[in-house]
Amino acid sequence: MIITIDGPVATGKSTIAKKLAESIGFIFFDTGAMYRALTFGILKNQIDLSDPDTLQNYLDHFQFDIKVIHHDRHYFVDKEDVSKLIRGKEVTSSVSKVSAIKAVREKLMAIQRELAEGVNAVFEGRDMGTVVFPNANIKIFLTGRNDVRAKRRYDELTSKFPEETKELTLEKCLEEITKRDNYDSTREYSPLCQAEDAFVIDTSDLSIDEVVYKILEYKDTIKTKRPS
């Protein structure tokens, strides 16, 4: 069975998807981390995004792996553990631009579909239920008010990167979220959008456990007629 969880930034997708997967014994895949890993590789190797041939050559030879170490997922690019590095400022500021490129999305879509073969999994991202797994058994789309999402983003960044975010403000986070929403929803290839058959949950005033409970209720009641 494949469950997809999509939605804009700071709606709690990763945390919710991970907890859901743990509660039902499924494998959790954070596709945002995959895009960050690829972005890290592109930046490290100084790949010119305006040169399609150079980019495609890198994608053809891109080495990516996921390993579970001490119960945590670690992401490897060219055999280097980049799990912490992909959360850095440079990757964060570049990942939207990289992820909007058709060749990049096609490469990662192929990887994601390969990872899904023969397993029960929860895939979290922005186009999981619309493009990557259009026949997923269960599709979830998370939303949230902009002010709540901005506060979540601010708290997350200032907690993880206290030194780098000394000048960060809540207003700046709100501005960046609005900009990111617009960019993701209007990009030419595989834009962020809600699947017609998705179960929509507004996470603004709900705890993580409450959202997971809603998804489990939905899972128990839906008739999963679509093949995985």
Curated annotation (Swiss-Prot):
GO cellular component: cytosol
Xref: Gene3D superfamilies: P-loop containing nucleotide triphosphate hydrolases
Similarity remark: Belongs to the cytidylate kinase family. Type 1 subfamily.
Swiss-Prot/TrEMBL catalytic activity: CMP + ATP = CDP + ADP; dCMP + ATP = dCDP + ADP
Subcellular location: Cytoplasm
Entry-linked NCBIfam families: cmk (TIGR00017)
InterPro entries in the record: Cytidylate_kin, Cytidylate_kinase_dom, P-loop_NTPase
Binding site for ATP: G7, P8, V9, A10, T11, G12, K13, S14, T15
GO biological process: nucleobase-containing small molecule interconversion; pyrimidine nucleotide metabolic process
Name of encoding gene: cmk
Protein name (record): Cytidylate kinase
UniProt keyword terms in alphabetical order: ATP-binding, Cytoplasm, Kinase, Nucleotide-binding, Transferase
MF terms (GO), sorted A to Z: ATP binding; CMP kinase activity; dCMP kinase activity
